[in-house]
Amino acid sequence: MKIFIFLFVFLLNCDKINNSNTLTQQIDSNTEINEIENPTDFYEKLSNAAISIIDSEVVYTPSYVSIKYPNGDVPAKTGVCSDVVIRAYRKLGIDLQKEVHEDMKANFSLYPNLKKWGLKTTDKNIDHRRVPNLEVFFARKGETLPITQNPSDYKTGDLVTWLLAGDAIPHIGIVTHIKSENGNPMIVHNVGSGQVLEDCLLNWKIVGHFKFMNKD
């Protein structure tokens, strides 16, 4: 299946998330992207799902928002990096809002909420949208993979987390089946320029590498 999108591929420096306009490279074109026509496993389906939600018009909006539960989402044209992951998984019938909430409710002390944010109970509106919580959840419920600087070690459907802006800002994205001109696996993420496909795997400090599929 072929989809046509208005694709922005950015090579950004870490300051973009702090509203810097500095770009090392920008490619802006009408680009044809091939989905995997007959995905053979969950992770190929996840890559297709990530590609399907690319939208450069999504505004990076880190505000706290009250949402329904389960299957709650912030307005479609807004979001942050974690919402890319949440939306892609939801296309495959997995509600990370519900999954993360239930695991946190049963294992609250294993999550960084108390230490990091001073929270003493779960919050269905925001817990699943916080990258540190997703890192704990994916490590507990999925598979933790090696962190390397070799792009070939990052496979279709993998989840990668980074620290940006001097290790101050956690970030997350989905590895796709699409390769850049350099042969690097491209990432669907939102670092401030919408839900975009970008050759950015090694742009920042990688701190997490996971696979996750709901085995229930």
PLM regions with names:
Residues 1-7:
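Sec-dependent signal peptide recognition
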Residues 11-13:
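C-terminal motif of bacterial Sec signal peptides marking the signal peptidase cleavage site
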Residues 15-17:
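Bacterial signal peptide processing site
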Residues 51, 55, 86-94, 101, ...:
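Sec-exported extracytoplasmic/periplasmic mature domains
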Residues 61-82, 95-121:
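Acidic helix-start/capping segments at beta-turn-to-alpha-helix junctions
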Residues 183-216:
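Low-complexity, Gly/Ser/Thr/Pro-rich intrinsically disordered linker/tail segments
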